[in-house]
Amino acid sequence: KPIQKPYPPLWVCGGGEKVTLKLLAKYGDYGNWDVDVDGFIQKSNILQNHCENVGRDFNEIGKTLHTNVLIADNQNDLDRKVEKLSTYTNIPKDYYYERPLIGTKDQVFETIDQYKEAGCIYLIAYIPDIVWGDTVNYLSELNQS
């Protein structure tokens, strides 16, 4: 912990289950992972075990997610966006389709709800179509609901 008080919150980012999550249990205020919902639940369960082992209240630690977010109206629109990204980045299309928050609006919003139910309190969204797409407009709808 930093010497100054109040100290800034300490984020421990990484999902290493033996070392990193143990450090998070001991010292962290927030943990941050890039995993699907099942992985988020798994990391949370392991973190909870580490918290019990070090005598820390698991609920004191904020669990957060960082990932790419790409939203489209329908599958055809999504395919077009992924094709454009793949061409621009030279990253295979499969990479994008495997990300948990890349899909249609309904798919992505449902997955975000699943993360919330799993205890995620904060999302750091990397928005690859920020300049030419409309994902950010879809995300703004989340704040209105």
Description of each model-found segment:
Residues 1-145:
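Active-site-adjacent structural elements that line small-molecule/cofactor binding pockets in enzymes
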